[in-house]
């Protein structure tokens, strides 16, 4: 039975979909003004993992992740570049999809864009005005009346009184309350705009997600996800808007993934420790980066460092070494490992424990490979099956272990030297065998002798 930590209740809860076996999940996606950074990658991989496990568990999942394609940052970057906002967002969306493909992230079922839902935003804003939850002061803006929504703060546990006392609030004479937030922004010179009942302008960030989620999934749905940095104010404001407009509970469960830290510090441009996904993939195999992101629990912060990446690479090498040399057959045996893996994943997607099961499975494969090849191969199939839930271990073992060899060594030359060494060993010419091994070592090639075969990989 699956349990999920619900940020709304601050507790693990048994997961019960609203509609039988059907699950509807919405995740806040990218604001596409720049290349995706590792924090985006963390969120994308975390909810890809959730998607894979829900489907593996037999749920009929509809996964929606939005694209914010109009925003202050987008407008500013487009102006800096001397291009239109939609030209910028088109490039960045293509780049995001390429990053996802390389990290083996499954595409969402729907990927709505904010600019395609302007009419829906007008409708929800008008509903909020009609119900007294929003007001138009006459300057082209429309604001949400925070004080009217009784449940404000229920997600973040923040109190309106404390927010008023503790916040550094900019004076805005158009607001009735300093905590009120914008639903519709009146047009400014040089900015893209859309016609509306309140004059030309563009939507505020928070209303975009309320409209896209309810348009795609209905007024109430099962899971709403995103990074922990979105809990307040973005997700708090989504709840306030949506529940005031519909009179219904917005999302049943709220899931938030942890942040990325760089060598123990928060990742930020100001600290000059900011990495895009493509920066990291220049140095590390995509599966290494993905494993780093799934091996920690999704709610935990991840420390990104050279050491952590080396650890991730080492773990994958152990897995692929176990798979190497075994025929690809259907998963067979290892039911106890499957049960332990499932228990871990059903406990709020407990990937650290799930990964520990994979290591135990590797030990069993290695124990059997010289005595019972058929059993070892069946367990290797099981390892790939469970690895697929994490989005790893689907490559050919040699392809992973030799990744990066292109341009560094000539594979044909290496294979020729290995064959010459095998012949020398057959002839009991140990001096020649050692000489060839030394030559390969000097080339950065590591040989691994096993029963009846020699394989190779590049040294770290």
Swiss-Prot record:
Cofactor binding, note field: Binds 1 zinc ion per subunit.
Binding residues annotated for Zn(2+), in chain numbering: 28, 209, 234, 238
Residue pairs linked by disulfide bridges in the UniProt entry: none
GO CC terms, sorted: cytosol
Catalytic reaction equation(s): tRNA(Cys) + L-cysteine + ATP = L-cysteinyl-tRNA(Cys) + AMP + diphosphate
Residues that, per the record, bind ATP: 269
Cell location: Cytoplasm
Keyword Zinc: yes
Cofactors demanded by this protein: Zn(2+)
Residues spanned by motif 'HIGH' region: 30-40
Top enzyme class: ligase
GO molecular function: ATP binding; cysteine-tRNA ligase activity; zinc ion binding
Matching NCBIfam families: cysS (TIGR00435)
PANTHER family in the cross-refs: CYSTEINE--TRNA LIGASE, CYTOPLASMIC (PTHR10890:SF3), CYSTEINYL-TRNA SYNTHETASE (PTHR10890)
Oligomeric form and interacting partners: Monomer.
Record's protein name: Cysteine--tRNA ligase
Organism: Pseudomonas putida (strain GB-1)
Lineage of source species: Bacteria, Pseudomonadati, Pseudomonadota, Gammaproteobacteria, Pseudomonadales
């Amino acid at each position: 039975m699956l349990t999920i930590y619900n940020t709304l209740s601050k507790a693990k809860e048994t997961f019960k979909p609203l509609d039988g076996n059907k699950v509807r999940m919405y995740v806040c996606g990218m604001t596409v003004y720049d290349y995706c950074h590792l924090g985006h990658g963390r969120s994308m991989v975390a909810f890809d993992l959730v998607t894979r496990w829900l489907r593996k568990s037999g749920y009929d999942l509809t996964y929606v992740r939005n694209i914010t394609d109009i925003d202050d940052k987008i407008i500013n970057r487009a102006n800096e570049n001397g291009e239109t906002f939609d030209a910028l967002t088109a490039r960045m969306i293509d780049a995001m999809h390429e990053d996802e493909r390389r990290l083996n992230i499954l595409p969402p079922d729907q990927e709505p864009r904010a600019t395609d839902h302007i009419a829906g935003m007008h409708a929800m804003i008008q509903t909020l005005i009609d119900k007294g939850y929003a007001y138009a002061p006459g300057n082209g803006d429309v604001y949400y009346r925070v004080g009217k929504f009784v449940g404000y703060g229920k997600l973040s546990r923040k109190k309106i009184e404390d927010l008023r006392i503790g916040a550094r609030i900019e004076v805005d004479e158009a607001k009735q309350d300093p905590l009120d937030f914008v639903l519709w922004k009146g047009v400014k010179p040089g900015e893209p705009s859309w016609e509306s009942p309140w004059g030309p302008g563009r939507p505020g960030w928070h209303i975009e997600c309320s409209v896209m989620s309810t348009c795609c999934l209905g007024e109430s749905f099962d899971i709403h996800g995103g990074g922990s940095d979105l809990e307040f104010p973005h997700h708090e404001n989504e709840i306030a808007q949506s529940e005031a407009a519909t009179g219904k509970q917005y999302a049943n469960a709220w899931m938030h993934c942890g942040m990325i830290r760089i060598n123990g510090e928060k990742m930020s441009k100001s600290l000059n420790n900011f990495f895009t996904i493509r920066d990291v993939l220049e140095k590390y195999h995509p599966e290494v980066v993905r494993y780093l992101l799934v091996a920690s629990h999704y709610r935990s912060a991840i420390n990104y460092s050279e050491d952590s990446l080396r650890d991730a690479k080492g773990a994958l090498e152990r897995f692929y070494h176990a798979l190497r040399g075994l025929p690809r057959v259907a998963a067979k045996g290892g039911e106890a490992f499957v049960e332990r893996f499932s228990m871990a994943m059903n406990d709020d997607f407990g990937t650290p424990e799930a990964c520990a099961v994979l290591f135990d499975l590797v030990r069993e494969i290695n124990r059997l490979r010289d005595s019972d090849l058929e059993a070892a191969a069946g367990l290797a199939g099981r390892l790939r099956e469970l690895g697929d839930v994490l989005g790893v271990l689907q490559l050919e073992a040699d392809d992973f272990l030799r990744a990066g060899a292109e341009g560094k060594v000539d594979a044909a030359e290496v294979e020729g030297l290995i064959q010459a060494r095998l012949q020398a060993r057959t002839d009991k010419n140990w001096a020649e065998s050692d000489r060839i091994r030394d030559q390969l070592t000097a080339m950065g090639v590591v040989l691994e002798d096993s029963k009846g075969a020699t394989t190779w990989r590049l040294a770290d």
